[in-house]
Amino acid sequence: MDALTVAPVPPGRVKLPDRRHAVVIGSGFGGLAAAIRLGARGYRVTVLERLGAPGGRAAVHRQDGFTFDAGPTIITAPYLLEELWTLCGRRMADDVELRRIDPFYRIRFDDGTVFNATADYDAMRAEVARIEPDDVPGFERFIRESKRIYEVAFHQLGDQPFHKVATLLRAAPDLLRLGGHRTVYAKVSKYFRNETLRIAFSFHPLLIGGNPFTTTAYFCLVGHLERLHGVHYAMGGTGAIVAGLVRLIEDQGGTLRLNAEVEQITVENGRATGLRLAGGERIAADIVVSNADVAWTYTKLLSEHKRRRWTDRRLARARYSMGLVVWYFGTNRRFEDVYQHTMVLGPRYEGLLQDIFHRKVLTPDFSMYLHRPSANDPSLAPPGCDAFYVLAPVPNLASGTDWSTEAEPYRQRMQQRLEETVMPGLGECIVTSRMLTPQNFRDRLLSVNGAAFSLEPQLFQSAWFRPHNISEEVEGLFLVGAGTHPGAGVPGVVSSARVLDQVVPDPAMLRATAR
């Protein structure tokens, strides 16, 4: 990705009443980043959030003295966030403290084997050698290959708009040369023979809603991204970043409206002219940016507009990411042996993922990601206590699972598994608890099929094949977030806002819809 090309707006310009109006639907990371970038370019910005607090998937839950991040817990490529502060003439470090976490995470396999992923090349090499000495040469080659993929697929193309076929054709030779037609697991298997190591180096697509056995090998870049930029935690939780971004928008002169549910994007002569809220209020806009779920945007917010490409039928047939069961809980004692980021894997890998993504059946076995933020940030729990967040990938709602009856039995199985592996005695010390299931993702976040990461990142749902950042259906409508290019994850959704710099017209060149 190239350096910044957008200059900060001089403070004297932020209150001009005749600036062109940009309305952003949704206040997830993508929407907040888009709002800041539009404000920096001279737009008057309004952000509309249907819920009572900003953040979207990055909202915050507080109960019984504990603070839980609802969604993202890992910050990689922090420079993408730092750019937003730079655009406003500020330093991110003055508002948010990022703490580097290394090792990144600890992977516990079903047989008790532990693998520590780290930025330290020699330490990582030693981890590989400890598990399978014969795979060390393959590890060294894979590290070099991961870097090459990163430099093309993320550094060069991650913030480039892919709404033109010509862009895809120019990129295709490099992407094919790097094995983009293969899957992540197939790519990793070229370098590692040991199945434990194949799992350790191929699971990353799950962090963005993908199946390692179907996700394009471009996503082998994630490992290099982590090593290059580090894995970080925001002190106070990811919600501290959300709060900082909201302050930037307000300091630019922008507005965040909560409990403002958008019912329809209004269109005249093929151009977006504003929005109609659920209560009937109409808001005029020169451009509209949707950070809502991309399928929801097209099927619900543009239901009154005839669409050529992203029709209801096409979106119904698209492949969506898996769902998640997320259990937040607090304990009245600390579990000092539990690392901040821990993967607790079950007995199956490929078979489990086939059940989740393709067969769409809920199975007795599962794998979990356990987050213990209070390991480094005791402010998130009362004294002597610990805050936890554990999630398990599950089929999305296309499975027909009734989570109103399945949620509690599933939570109990998660608790039992934690007690058997890394948290003995857990059941005796839980003092607060809450859950999210795919039904919550559907009903609260308006995510189609309750998918946790919108569209699944398969080859033919990536880059040009993904819904574009500039809408093909309506002039003046732009998309950011997990369902558009480049995809899910904090770096992906923040980069989707970066793409807008190249596709949103300069406000001075835009014919007025509203003042």
Language-model-detected regions and their locations in the chain:
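Rossmann-like flavin
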Residues: 108-214
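Helical element adjacent to the flavin cofactor pocket in flavoenzyme catalytic cores
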Residues: 221-278
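N-terminal glycine-rich phosphate/pyrophosphate-binding loop and immediately adjacent elements
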Residues: 13-151
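A glycine-rich dinucleotide-binding beta-alpha-beta segment and adjacent secondary-structure elements
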Residues: 194-208, 363-371, 424-486
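Extreme N-terminal leader/targeting segments of oxidoreductases
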Residues: 1-23, 40-41, 458-465, 471, ...
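A conserved FAD-binding loop/helix module that cradles the flavin
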Residues: 72, 482-505
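C-terminal segments that line or cap access tunnels to active or ligand-binding sites in enzymes
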Residues: 332-442
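Mid-domain catalytic core of redox enzymes
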Residues: 2, 263-382
